[in-house]
Every structure is written in structure tokens, then in C-alpha cells.
A protein has these predicted regions:
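N-terminal Rossmann-like or analogous alpha/beta NTP/dinucleotide-binding catalytic cores
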Residues: 1-100
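Active-site cores that bind ATP or allylic diphosphates and position pyrophosphate for catalysis
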Residues: 65-179
Length: 179
């Protein structure tokens, strides 16, 4: 959902992420790298999941609420108000559902995340539970793996904000120079 209005930036990000994965030792002979948006089945699965989640449940997700605030989305921003971004994009708002399809499609049993992502995985578990109740025991309910080491916890952004994030443009990339 980041840079949806800038396809060239999306293409560049894909290349940069792939290079980052390779630079930290991910071996393409042992791991499959793919572009999520090129796997239509992930979108289809998310579409089914959307019928299992209410708008109210998405609104209560602490991660979604925090990201809305960080990105400056305003639900009722007045037309022409340049101090806030206009509305919350549906793709952004339903990201927890998309993330659930990413996790469940590949039958992930454990998902390593930071503490801030715990509500997203909990929502995935809720979706799995509802799906399995309707369609039978089909999906794997993933476990959350949180870091034990405090040094692995959330890093502050380069701008001093609480969270380092590529979408907030306040992070350090593996490809950055020492400066």
C-alpha cells in the first residue's frame, strides 16, 4: 500500500528489497523470492478473508490505529485541508487482512515479529479461527515469535520518531553509505 500512487517508486523498492535480502545472505537456491502483487491467489484469499472481519474490528487494531496516526491520515479531513492526508485508503486500512493471506497461504506455523506487530498476527489468528469454523480445519493458526533480546526491539527513526520505517522515510538502509 506504500507508494500506490508512484509505480516507479514501487518498482525501485522491489529491486532494493531483493538486493537487501541477498546482501544479508538469503540464498535463492534455498528460499523463494517473489513479488507479492504478482501472486493473484494472495489477493483472492484476502478477498475471502474480508468477509470474516468487520470494519469495527479493523478500527480496534492498535497497529492500524498507530500507523494511521504516524502517516497523518484523517478520516474526516475537509476537502482542501492540506494539513492532513485525505482519508484512509481502503488498501491501507485492510492491510491486516492482506497480511493474513500472506501468512496463511504458505502455511506459516511461526511468524517472527516485533512487539508492535503482535496485534496484526493476533488478527490473523482470529481470521484463521473463523475460516476453519466455516470451512473445516484448513488453515494453520500461526504462533507469534517475539524477540527475547531487548536490543532487537523497535529502533527509533532517524528523525527521532518512535518507529524506524521505510514508509516513513526515517530508516537506515543496508545500501546506505556511512554518511
Amino acid at each position: 500500500t506504500d507508494n500506490a500512487d508512484n509505480p516507479e517508486k514501487v518498482r525501485q523498492n522491489i529491486i532494493e528489497v531483493a538486493l537487501d535480502y541477498l546482501s544479508v545472505g538469503l540464498d535463492p537456491a534455498k528460499s523463494t523470492l517473489f513479488i507479492q502483487s504478482q501472486v493473484a491467489e494472495l489477493c483472492e484469499l484476502a478477498f475471502y478473508y474480508m468477509n470474516l472481519v468487520t470494519v469495527q474490528r479493523l478500527q480496534r487494531n492498535p497497529t492500524v490505529k498507530a500507523e494511521i496516526a504516524l502517516r497523518g491520515f484523517a478520516e474526516g479531513a475537509a476537502e482542501g485541508d492540506t494539513t492532513q492526508r485525505q482519508g484512509i485508503p481502503v488498501g491501507f486500512f485492510t492491510y491486516p487482512i492482506s497480511q493474513a493471506s500472506d501468512i496463511t497461504a504458505f502455511r506459516a506455523t511461526t511468524v517472527p515479529v516485533g512487539e508492535d506487530q503482535e496485534p496484526m498476527i493476533e488478527q490473523t489468528r482470529e481470521i484463521v479461527h473463523k475460516f476453519n469454523a466455516v470451512y473445516g480445519e484448513t488453515l494453520v493458526e500461526p504462533e507469534i515469535l517475539l524477540p527475547e533480546n531487548a536490543a532487537c526491539m523497535r529502533l527509533p527513526g532517524t528523525d527521532g520518531k518512535a518507529k524506524m520505517s521505510k514508509s516513513l522515510n526515517n530508516c537506515i538502509y543496508l545500501s546506505d553509505t556511512a554518511e
